[in-house]
């Protein structure tokens, strides 16, 4: 899609409108769909157009890549499409963090942007984010060290501005109070690290006075220590890798996460395995039980519900391309539950009195913002206020009853058969 700006077209329905590109007939032309059939020649012949393309943020789901270099040497003949590949493309995702009043946003394996809500006299909602100068062009994610105001790029480029040098175990941190300067000098605090336990940094979470960085196999703690080293970094766990970028959450002094190696973990000064009574149900696909989809682990989202002292992990079951299951841990009662609930993201109560979440549905055209020629293939996201009422109420006030049920598994009775309740 693109937004036309600075146009001289006279057709009012063409000016400053977002369009979906329908086809690309050549390297210099593309096709869009107008809201109504043209009755004159204005939109065809008048003026010039400066298109402003949206940023490509990646695939909708984890996708195998079958292009040049897929497979082993000599696997097939020249020019023959490959039917197998070891190259996997991650789904598009974002890491978001505050740098003071500004928002820092990094596309997963992409660029970093900054949104400045107060920029001159322009209203915040009409102000667009812009690419943050001086930053790497390909990083797994970014995170801000609040205590000392460094912007940290994880899984980033060894040569800034050269995407082919991305090293998914390489870490850069900016100069203090300057998120655009990464070159270390004798008078600034910018610097780099490379960690070595694992093959890629998957995600990171802020703790009380540290950052917990999780690879696909291990856990590291990164802490601000001041000059001359700025940061220290040490490995605190192994065989505890993170499943997906958003599969970890900080709660009351500890970080909880779901591992791609099986099981749940917590870091509260040391890495510990979290006992889980439903681990087999969540991880194992056997018979009619469909465990987690390992192919879509990047979609897992961990959310904290402080109203009920719960941590929720939303995940896609085996055979599903999108999130449709939930596993919940009550960290006060130390009780696990599972369920069917599709939530793509989840935000705990903070500024607002209720938790809020989103749900993505495939093959439904979005309704906001208005995009001319939009197709259902783009999918639709709903925004939910959680933990209010007992039914689902849409934006128009239409109420739908939520079907609820309880399902349990086998469990042992007390030897006397007493004290059991359902």
Annotated model-derived regions:
Residues 3-92, 120-124, 134:
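Small/polar beta-strand repeat architecture
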Residues 9-12, 94-95, 209-210, 318-319:
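Short consensus segments that form the blades of beta-propeller domains
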Residues 30, 102-115, 123:
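Hydrophobic or amphipathic alpha-helical targeting/insertion segments
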Residues 33-41, 108, 116-118, 315-317, ...:
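Secondary-structure transition/turn motif
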Residues 59, 73, 77, 93-95, ...:
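Beta-sheet repeat architectures centered on beta-propellers
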Residues 75-89, 121-298, 334:
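Beta-propeller and closely related beta-pinwheel folds
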Residues 104-105, 211, 255, 355:
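Hydrophobic beta-strand segments that make up the repeating blades of beta-propeller
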């Amino acid at each position: 899609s693109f937004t036309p700006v600075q146009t001289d077209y006279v057709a009012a329905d063409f000016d400053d409108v977002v369009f979906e590109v329908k086809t690309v007939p050549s390297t210099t032309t593309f096709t869009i769909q107008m809201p109504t059939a043209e009755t004159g020649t204005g939109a065809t012949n008048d003026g010039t157009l400066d298109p402003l393309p949206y940023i490509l943020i990646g695939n909708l789901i984890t996708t195998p890549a079958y292009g040049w270099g897929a497979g082993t040497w000599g696997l097939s003949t020249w020019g023959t499409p490959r039917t197998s590949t070891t190259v996997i493309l991650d789904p598009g995702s974002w890491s978001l963090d505050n740098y003071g009043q500004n928002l820092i946003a990094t596309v997963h394996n992409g660029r970093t942007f900054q949104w400045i809500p107060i920029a001159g006299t322009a209203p915040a909602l009409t102000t667009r984010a812009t690419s943050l100068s001086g930053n790497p062009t390909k990083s797994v994610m970014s995170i801000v060290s609040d205590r000392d105001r460094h912007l940290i790029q994880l899984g980033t480029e060894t040569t800034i501005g050269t995407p082919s040098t991305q090293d998914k175990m390489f870490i850069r941190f900016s100069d203090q109070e300057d998120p655009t300067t990464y070159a270390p000098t004798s008078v600034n605090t910018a610097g780099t690290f490379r960690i070595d336990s694992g093959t890629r940094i998957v995600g990171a979470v802020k703790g009380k006075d540290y950052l917990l960085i999780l690879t696909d196999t291990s856990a590291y703690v990164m802490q601000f220590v001041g000059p001359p080293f700025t940061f220290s970094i040490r490995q605190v766990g192994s065989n505890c890798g993170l499943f997906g970028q958003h599969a970890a959450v900080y709660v009351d002094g500890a970080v909880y996460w779901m591992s791609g190696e099986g099981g749940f973990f917590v870091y509260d000064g040391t890495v510990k395995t979290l006992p889980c009574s439903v681990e087999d149900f969540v991880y194992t696909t056997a018979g009619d039980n469909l465990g987690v989809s390992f192919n879509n682990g990047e979609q897992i989202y961990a959310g904290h519900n402080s109203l009920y002292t719960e941590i929720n992990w939303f995940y896609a079951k085996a055979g599903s391309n999108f999130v449709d299951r939930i596993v919940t841990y009550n960290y006060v009662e130390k009780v696990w539950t599972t369920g069917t609930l599709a939530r793509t993201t989840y935000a705990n109560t903070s500024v607002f009195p209720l938790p809020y979440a989103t749900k993505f549905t495939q093959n439904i055209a979005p309704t906001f913002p208005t995009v001319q020629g939009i197709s259902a293939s783009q999918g639709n996201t709903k925004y939910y206020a959680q933990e209010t009422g007992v039914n689902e109420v849409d934006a128009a006030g239409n109420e739908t009853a939520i079907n609820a049920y309880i399902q349990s598994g086998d469990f042992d009775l007390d030897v006397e058969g007493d004290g059991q309740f359902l």
